[in-house]
Each structure stands twice: as structure tokens, then as C-alpha cells.
Swiss-Prot record:
Record-listed E.C. numbers: 3.4.21.-
Induction: Expression is strongly increased during growth on protein-rich medium.
Lineage: Eukaryota, Fungi, Dikarya, Ascomycota, Pezizomycotina
Glycosylation sites: 123, 126, 252, 264, 408
Protein name as annotated: Subtilisin-like protease 6
Ranges of residues in domain Peptidase S8: 135-412
Localization annotation: Secreted
Taxonomic source organism: Trichophyton rubrum
Keywords noted in UniProt: Allergen, Glycoprotein, Hydrolase, Protease, Secreted, Serine protease, Signal, Virulence, Zymogen
GO biological process: proteolysis
Length: 412
């Protein structure tokens, strides 16, 4: 995954339908979290109807004793609510089979899917330049041909743009960020640090002073994965919701700030309608999102949020413009970016070299921030701009997959 560790791709299948509500089941290899579910409402459901539904749920939970079989510990019930852009409303929590059946009988509910484990995906005219770049990916994005050691870029370098890194956190004190990184929110544990390193590496590629594409961008840590690089799908969606609200000026819809914001998700799990709908809500709010395609060397349509068409899905390339052997592929892939043996930042002030589509995606996020800083329009349409600028050079990209490798338009 660049994704660092492997996420298991799976297609969710409809298990049953009760009064129009689908109850989905994950395939046999998904790491489902016992008794945890995400309940997604129909798009036409109003805020008032959503609140009425969750009020009913709370009252219903209070009126019954929900206990696990063979255990005296009660079920937690509803734990989080989500509202993204006025078009995606959902909640998640811990429920027994009887409660799931009751919830599914409500006409306002679109579908219910099990919560599961999500993991990292690692395995110009006024140009300035950086010689002897510490990571080959920088030189490749700034040049039409491979093999260079200089990164050519405009000195605007993403200034005035904010990048939300939805990951394991960021070492915001790393000297390469020069004070441009800050802590946002934590949705997975009580440690407001990057105890894994994945998020810091990703953020370094997006906006490090030496290691980043957008050297002037502001960075915000949104922690959704723990020290082991894993978390729940529901927790990831909660982080997506928070980031969208911040990027939209703290509100629920599109604001001027949205067009000056980018997001990176170097993570993924089995295909999830809930995750894809949340990603679409972010795109609909006018925010550009780069997403890792995954590291299973298979069609990325089986992974989320990579399979959501409105995001910019990124596969990983090698130093000689080949497809990285681990990289996912397929029609949902928008572009390739450097993802094999990428050197970037490590918590504690040092560096590390990692491989994965997790490393490719931040090249695209950083390029998105860079282009917005140059005056290009932000939002999901920025992916089309990036594709038009890209060069069709990837050798054997995979069946039905683009061969386009990102390029910053330096003219070099």
C-alpha cells in the first residue's frame, strides 16, 4: 500500500435487504471488528430526520440490556456520528445482531456494513532548483526524463495551501518542516505523536523543506492509525470528517478554504461503500484528495478509498519508469508517481527509505499543493489537470491502466 503493510482487498456483498436497507458482509479475509458496524443513511435524509433516527436509537438502547453472548459487558451502542457536506450522514458503534436487525428496518437507512481494520499502504519561467536531491522522486517529478538529480520548481512552492495528512500522525517538530507542521486531531489513541513513522515520511514527501515537493505548504496531522499502522474504518472516516470541516472553513460545506486545501490518504482496506461515500463528500466539497492505490499487485477497484472515482488514485513507479512490482493497477488508477525506495523523514529528526503506493500518493498530494500555489484551481478537477500534465512513459503499467507519470511542468 504505500500502503506499508498489506491491506486485504475484498468486495462487500449484500447479505440481506430489509425494507430497503442493505446489510453488507465483508469477504472471508477482511479483518472485521467484532460487533462493530457503520450505518449509512440515504442521501435524501435531512438533518432533522437523522437526528430523530439517532434519538430513537439512543432510547431503544436504553430500554434494553445489550450484552455479548457469554459476557456481562454491555454493548457500547452508538459511538460516533458523521455528517460530511450535507450528503453523507452515518453513525458507527457496537451493536448486537438484534439491534442491527432493528436498525435495518428503518426506511431512512441505506445500508449497514461491518467495521474493519484499515492499514497503511507502504511496502517554469521563474524556476529555482534543488541540486543533488536526497530522494530520486523529487528530480523525476521536476523533469521529463529519468535519471536526473536536480528538482526544478517554482519558488511559490505551495505557499498559502494547507495539506491534511490522514495517517499515523506527524513529528511536527522535525526540523525539515521548519515550523510549518501542526497537530490537528487524534481519532485512534491517546498518543499525540507519530509513534509509527509512516505519517511523518508521507508528510515529508508532501512538504518537507529538503524532501518535499511543496516546500512552502502548511501541514496538519490527522491521526487515524496507531503505532502499528492500523486503525478502524470508522475511525478513518471520523478523521476524514474532521479534516473536511477544517478545510471548509470549519463548516459543513464548501468554502474558499476548500480550494486552498489538499488531503492525502496513504492507507486503505477492503472496498467500503461508506469509505467511498465519505471520500466523495470531500471531493464534492471542493477538496483535492490523493489516495494510494494499494500494494497487492491487483486491481485497485477492490480497495477503498482508492476505488472512489472522484479521488486521485495513485500507483507506484520505479526509478527506471516501470510499474513497482507490488503496486495495484486498473482503470481506477489516475496516475503513477515515484513509490519505490523513496527517502523522506523519520520521527526524531532522521530519515528513512520506504517503498509503497503510500510513498507515491504524497508525491501527487504535494504536486497538487504546488499547482494550487501557482494559481491552478483546486478541488477534484485538479486531478484532471495533473493527468493532462503527466507524461505517458510507464512501461507495462498493468492491464487497463494508464501509463502516465506525474510531472510538474517545469519545462526541464
Amino acid at each position: 500500500m504505500g500502503f506499508i503493510t498489506k491491506a486485504i482487498p475484498i468486495v462487500l456483498a449484500a447479505l440481506s435487504t430489509v425494507n430497503g436497507a442493505r446489510i453488507l458482509e465483508a469477504g472471508p479475509h477482511a479483518e472485521a471488528i467484532p460487533n462493530k458496524y457503520i450505518v449509512v443513511m440515504k442521501r435524501e435524509v435531512s438533518d432533522e430526520a437523522f437526528n430523530a433516527h439517532t434519538t430513537w436509537l439512543s432510547q431503544s438502547l436504553n430500554s434494553r440490556i445489550m450484552r455479548r453472548a457469554g459476557s456481562s459487558k454491555p454493548m457500547a451502542g452508538m459511538q460516533d456520528k458523521y455528517s460530511l457536506g450535507g450528503i453523507f450522514r452515518a453513525y458507527s458503534g457496537e451493536f448486537d445482531d438484534a439491534m442491527i436487525k432493528d436498525i435495518s428496518s428503518h426506511d431512512d437507512v441505506d445500508f449497514i456494513e461491518p467495521d474493519f481494520v484499515v492499514r497503511t499502504t507502504t511496502n517554469g519561467t521563474n524556476l529555482t532548483h534543488q541540486d543533488n536531491v536526497p530522494s530520486w522522486g523529487l528530480a523525476r517529478v521536476g523533469s521529463k526524463k529519468p535519471g536526473g538529480t536536480t528538482y526544478y520548481y517554482d519558488p511559490s512552492a505551495g505557499k498559502g495551501v494547507t495539506a491534511y495528512i490522514i495517517d499515523t500522525g506527524i513529528d511536527i517538530d522535525h526540523e525539515d518542516f521548519q515550523g510549518r507542521a501542526k497537530w490537528g486531531e487524534n481519532f485512534v489513541d491517546q498518543q499525540n505523536t507519530d509513534c509509527n513513522g509512516h505519517g511523518t515520511h508521507v508528510a515529508g514527501t508532501v512538504g518537507g523543506t529538503k524532501y518535499g515537493l511543496a516546500k512552502g505548504v502548511s501541514l496538519v496531522a490527522v491521526k487515524v492509525l496507531d503505532c502499528d499502522g492500523s486503525g478502524s474504518n470508522s475511525g478513518v472516516i471520523k478523521g476524514m470528517e474532521w479534516a473536511m470541516r477544517q478545510a471548509s472553513g470549519g463548516g459543513n460545506g464548501t468554502a474558499k478554504a476548500a480550494g486552498k486545501s489538499v488531503m492525502n490518504m496513504s492507507l486503505g482496506g477492503p472496498r467500503s461503500e461508506a469509505s467511498n461515500q465519505a471520500a466523495k463528500a470531500i471531493s464534492d466539497a471542493g477538496i483535492f484528495m490523493a489516495v494510494a492505490a494499494g500494494n497487492e499487485n491487483m486491481d485497485a477497484q477492490h480497495s477503498s478509498p482508492a476505488s472512489e472515482p472522484s479521488v486521485c488514485t495513485v500507483a507506484a513507479s520505479t526509478k527506471d519508469d516501470g510499474k513497482a512490482d507490488f503496486s495495484n493497477y486498473g482503470a481506477v488508477v489516475d496516475v503513477y508517481a515515484p513509490g519505490k525506495d523513496i527517502t523522506s523523514l523519520k520521527p526524531g529528526g532522521s530519515t528513512d527509505t520506504l517503498s509503497g503506493t503510500s510513498m507515491a500518493s504524497p508525491h501527487v498530494c504535494g504536486l497538487g499543493a504546488y499547482l494550487i500555489g501557482l494559481g491552478k484551481q483546486g478541488g477534484p478537477g485538479l486531478c484532471d489537470t495533473i493527468k493532462k500534465m503527466a507524461n505517458d512513459v510507464i512501461q507495462s503499467p498493468g492491464e487497463g491502466t494508464t501509463g502516465k507519470l506525474i510531472y510538474n511542468g517545469s519545462g526541464k
